[in-house]
Amino acid sequence: MPHSVSEFIRFYNSPFSYWCNKTNKLVDEKKIDAKYKIQINASKLISKQLLTKAQEHEVVLKDKYRISENLNVVDMSNKDSSNKVFLKELEKNPDVIFQPYISSKDFVGRLDFVKIVDDNLHIIDAKLSSSIKTEHIMQLFVYREILETVTKKQVTECFLFLGDLQMHKVEFDEYKEIYAELKNQFMDFNNSYDPETPPYPKKGEELQEYDDEAKKIWIKDNGLELLYRIQAKQIEKLKNNDIKTVEELKNTNLEKIDGMGETTFIKYKKLAQLLNDSTENKISYEIKDASLNGLLKPKKGDLYIDFEGYPFLTIGRNFEYLYGIWSNDKNDSFTYYWSDDEEEEKNSFVSFIEKLLEHLELYPDAKFYHYFSYEISSLRRSAQNFGVYEKELEQLIEKKCFIDLFTIVNSSLLIGASSYSLKTVEKLAGINRNEDLQS
């Protein structure tokens, strides 16, 4: 039975995620016992908003072909497609075929666009991404293989229609060996699949909705992946020196290893000790800088800001559906601006900036605290996108009105936790919230 192209790309991004997804699919199909069912992290599933935007992006190109270029476009997106139906449409010699669903011995998938040029074929894949990624090229390799197998025609060119609404030609030559090796690994992996033996999840893989399952394995194995911000290549260097767990790193007598700076190695040893000593209710930490990097004392007029958004709804920035402002005054006042669409988002952004500017008239020395650099990056992208308050925002940044508390925490503390999220750091201050904070 052929494999879906989307699952092949999932395997490229993470063999562990692919194994989990395959296992759940087999359980749902009642081909293996229900005891193998794996819980997913629903918050990591692709949002409906993103799927809608992706579909709209495809329609933009379809309308460009159909209306702007006056091409004959056959739409197979809503048809019961098969190789036979597709070949029948191809015989009619249209200019473009939209979303045919075709299969070869190894793979099955729905291509975005097949363009007929003389006796040759072009493949165009629509992506919301702002740049070409290797996974896009791997996907085009599979599409080309399927299409050439089914039609016996040559695919001479492949393109990506990216978020900038431009065509980007893809060159395959330097990726041929990568694709061949990846396909072999994929086929071998499926031939030896065992629901009892998952591949080990590696740091840096796109674990998607199976990230919690990966964390369970890391915790069970006391894996080095639990160390804060450690990279896969650093884990390999430690394993090459017979250091395979957090406890082994904590107890090693080594003071340095090849390929890793001495300062970095010592930092990870200290983090391993703190992590090993931490419990669910009490997190161990060490103060590196007692001044907390010059953190100012809180004063009247200081504000605390936080945003929530959907990724990739608009190219280059998030759709910010919530701007929040909390004031540490006697009323603990909280102001928020909610948006259901991009027009409302602009109004919310304008209201948010105007609120800050008005606040500074009352409290000229006020600081606006946030956690991580996300808020500043988001504000800059929104100001540029909406064409409002760009100058005023830059002035606020230059005057250092915004204070990133994460920078202070990261430079001042070593924490025995896998994450320096706000939810984690709050525990150090004895704060326990009921809300499930994401940052």
Model-predicted segments: where are they?
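Short coil/turn segments at secondary-structure boundaries
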Residues: 22-23, 74, 198-203, 283-288, ...
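Conserved DEDDh/DEDDy metal-dependent 3′-5′ exonuclease domain
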Residues: 78-80, 89, 93-104, 108-190, ...
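Short amphipathic alpha-helical coiled-coil/interface segments
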Residues: 54, 58, 179-182, 242-243
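Long, highly charged, low-complexity intrinsically disordered interaction regions
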Residues: 171-237
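Short helix/loop capping segments that flank catalytic or ligand/cofactor-binding pockets
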Residues: 20-21, 111, 134, 227, ...
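C-terminal extensions
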Residues: 208-327, 333-334
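Metal-dependent nuclease catalytic cores that hydrolyze phosphodiester bonds in DNA/RNA
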Residues: 1-116
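Short aromatic/hydrophobic-glycine micro-motifs
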Residues: 67, 243, 254, 388, ...
